[in-house]
Swiss-Prot record:
Family to which the UniProt record says this protein belongs: Belongs to the conotoxin O1 superfamily.
Major subcellular site: secreted
Coiled coil location: none
The keyword Disulfide bond appears for this protein: yes
Domain notes: The presence of a 'disulfide through disulfide knot' structurally defines this protein as a knottin. The cysteine framework is VI/VII (C-C-CC-C-C).
Disulfide cysteine pairs (residue numbers): C4-C19, C11-C23, C18-C28
Compartmental location: Secreted
GO cellular component annotations of the record: extracellular region; host cell presynaptic membrane
Name recorded for this polypeptide: Omega-conotoxin MVIID
Pro-peptide region(s): 1-3
Species this chain originates from: Conus magus (Magical cone)
Alphabetized PROSITE patterns for the sequence: OMEGA_CONOTOXIN (PS60004)
Length: 29
């Protein structure tokens, strides 16, 4: 998984969010 900082940070693709330091599809939690 791609690392990222903060929450809801836009990752390389749309509909990806920053959750627990990694880019995940959809919403966090």
């Amino acid at each position: 998984s791609t690392r990222c900082q903060g929450r809801g940070a836009s990752c390389r693709k749309t509909m990806y969010n920053c959750c627990s330091g990694s880019c995940n599809r959809g919403r966090c939690g």
